[in-house]
Swiss-Prot record:
Coiled coil: none annotated. Belongs to the RNA polymerase subunit omega family. Pfam families: RNA_pol_Rpb6. GO terms for biological process: DNA-templated transcription. Keywords: DNA-directed RNA polymerase, Nucleotidyltransferase, Transcription, Transferase. This is DNA-directed RNA polymerase subunit omega. The keyword Transcription applies. The lineage of its organism: Bacteria, Thermotogati, Thermotogota, Thermotogae, Kosmotogales.
Length: 79
């Protein structure tokens, strides 16, 4: 069974849609290298791979982006 990721919840937590995959990828790398999931073991077992674990952690607010000022470069300039 896989974990369902609610993209609307992710967008409420992280305002910039382009930051979601970047943050999830960096967290998944951290989990692969040295990190421990911040989810309960049953959820980790259901999620399976590192990217799903990272997305679920973001959705639940268990990890946050420290420097949101950096994310301003992701916002397109519309004329």
């Amino acid at each position: 069974m896989s974990v369902i990721i609610n993209y609307d919840k992710l967008l409420k937590r992280i305002r910039h849609k382009y930051a979601i995959p970047i943050a999830a990828a960096r967290r998944a790398e951290g989990l692969k290298d040295f990190g421990r999931p911040k989810l309960d073991p049953q959820m980790v077992k259901q999620a399976g791979d590192k990217i799903n674990i990272a997305l679920k952690e973001l959705e639940e607010g268990r990890i946050v982006i420290r420097n949101e000022e950096m994310l301003k470069i992701l916002v397109p300039k519309v004329k």
